Amino acid sequence: GLYGYGRIAKIVEGYAKAFGMNVIWWGSEDGRARAAADGKTISESREAFFATPDVLSVHVRLKPATKGMITATDLGQMRQDAVFVNTSRAGLIEDGALLPALNAGRPGMAALDVFDHEPITWDHDPIANHPNVICTPHIGFVTEDEFELQFADIFDQVAAFAKCAPIHMINPQVWQG
């Protein structure tokens, strides 16, 4: 299952299909509508989405509306043999929900690249030391293509700013260029 219908989730879908996985989608109402328009399989409900997949991978941006959007109830609906994957942001998971869910065996395993406190203190973090968790130190995005995309975007933004024509402004109302 893929939660979120953005660029990264679509790339992950290709990998999943290469391994013979059937992909189901969930996300915002708009994301589900776009996925459906693209002919993707949308879960019949949020509950079914968390209860069905062998692997559930999260690909959502963290913003005030998405903070804590994956709840203890959601995790508790996952199968005991399911893997929960989060390479997006730790804040998408309700505070304090993941460790008890893992201890209860739902989901049965987690693969994490993001943590509540980064850099992670490996020796003292109960999630990092959980026997059913695989961790990487927030390096899941590190690919040649991703570096090229990020640095090209940064270069474009700096060049535009130097020409007094900034792009991708979050608060254009304060620009007095």
Give residue spans per PLM region.
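Hydrophobic Val/Ile/Leu positions in short beta-strands of Rossmann-like dinucleotide-binding domains
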Residues: G1-L2
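Glycine-rich Rossmann-fold phosphate-binding loop(s) that bind the pyrophosphate
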Residues: Y5-G6
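Gly/Ala-rich phosphate-binding loop of Rossmann-like dinucleotide-binding domains
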Residues: E13, K17, L102-N103
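Residues at the starts of beta-strands that form the adenosine-phosphate
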Residues: M21-N22
